Amino acid sequence: MTVLTDSDILIEVSRGRDKALVSQWLELAQSDALILYSAVSAAELWAGARPPEYTALDALFEALLCVPIDATLGRCAGEYLRRYRKSHAVELGDALIAASAVERGARLWTRNRKHYPMPELAFYD
């Protein structure tokens, strides 16, 4: 199984406050699952990070595989924006994250499902 983690999950894992979520994270990490993150999520986490959090963020990102943004993801995200920007207020970052999951055949782990109305997108619980 391949799982792409959304920014909200990565934030909670890096801060460690939600014990149930951290437990679920550890269970996933110890399985044979491939855990991915989007370059968009990296940008969002680094933008909000404080210096005492830098080492933990470096360790978190080093343990996972980054999905880089390329032309294929750009096209897919652009299609999502065209389809869902007005009806669901989908923003560029969420469109790129959804495209990353769909193009990699990954399930998206997020607590913000309303940001992702794409029917072809599978979720991880």
Positions of predicted regions on the chain:
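Acidic, PIN/NYN-like endoribonuclease modules and their adjacent C-terminal/linker elements
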Residues: 1-2, 98-125
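Short, well-structured N-terminal submotif of metal-dependent ribonuclease cores
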Residues: 1-37, 46-62
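Histidine- and aromatic-rich ligand-binding microenvironments
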Residues: 6, 37-38, 90-91, 112-113, ...
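Generic structural signal for small/hydrophobic residues in well-ordered secondary structure
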Residues: 6-7, 45, 77, 101
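A generic structural signal for short hydrophobic patches within well-formed alpha-helices
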Residues: 10, 42-45, 74, 116
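Residues at secondary-structure transition points
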Residues: 20, 36, 40, 52, ...
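Short, hinge-like loop/turn segments at secondary-structure boundaries
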Residues: 52-56, 84, 125
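Active-site neighborhoods of divalent-metal-dependent phosphate/nucleic-acid chemistry enzymes
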Residues: 65-111
